[in-house]
Every structure is written in C-alpha cells, then in structure tokens.
Amino acid sequence: MESSTINAKKISVLLTLFSIIGYTAYSAHESILEIRQDGKLPLDIKCEVILVTLLFTFTTVIIASPLRSIQLNKWSHQRSDLAFLNSRTNFLRIKELKEKIEKVKN
C-alpha cells in the first residue's frame, strides 16, 4: 500500500512539473510571436526556462528510485534474441578483414 502511495506522489510531482514546463514553453512561444525587432527573448522568460529546467532535473533525481547494480552472471545465462549476431563470421572477423584491406591498399 505504501509503495502505491509513493508512486502516486511521484507521478503527481512529475505531472505538475510537466505542466509547468508546458506553461513555460507556451509563454516563450507567445513571446516569440510578439517579439520585437531585436529578436531577443525577455529576461523573465529566460529565467523561467532556466528555473523550471533546474527544478525538473533536481526533482527527478530526488524522487528517482535508487540505482541497482548490474549483475552479469544473472544476464549471461539467459538466452538472448541477439545471439545470432555472434554467429556472423564477418562480424567476428572484422578486425582481420580490416587488416587485409589495409595490406592490399599499401
């Protein structure tokens, strides 16, 4: 029950941040439509974009789940759908073929 509450809080925080980012993008777009001849965005729009980007980045890092270590032995014993790549002879011999081509060029 607690994990669903925590996930709901994370989702609500992220949705709030996405709506703030959307508002910032909209206000920047409206400002660009009414832009003066010098072609520069107003300072408040620039500050708003920087602030929202930093807020989104830090909040995402804070509410993210902890990183898990990669366990090679867990994954190495499972069958991979990409196993056919290891059976391609040209793929395995690319270094050898490259050396032959360079010898022919010289």
Swiss-Prot record:
One of its GO terms (cellular component) is EMC complex. The keyword Repeat does not apply. GO terms for biological process: protein insertion into ER membrane. It is found in: Endoplasmic reticulum membrane. Residues 34-46 are lumenal. Its main location: endoplasmic reticulum. The keyword Nucleus does not apply. It is a multi-pass membrane protein. It holds the Pfam family MMgT. It comes from the Eukaryota. Residues 1-12, 68-106 are cytoplasmic. InterPro entries: MMgT (IPR018937). Keywords: Endoplasmic reticulum, Membrane, Transmembrane, Transmembrane helix. The chain crosses the membrane at residues 13-33, 47-67. The EMC seems to be required for efficient folding of proteins in the endoplasmic reticulum (ER). Component of the ER membrane protein complex (EMC). Belongs to the membrane magnesium transporter (TC 1.A.67) family. This is ER membrane protein complex subunit 5. It comes from Schizosaccharomyces pombe (strain 972 / ATCC 24843) (Fission yeast). The gene is emc5.
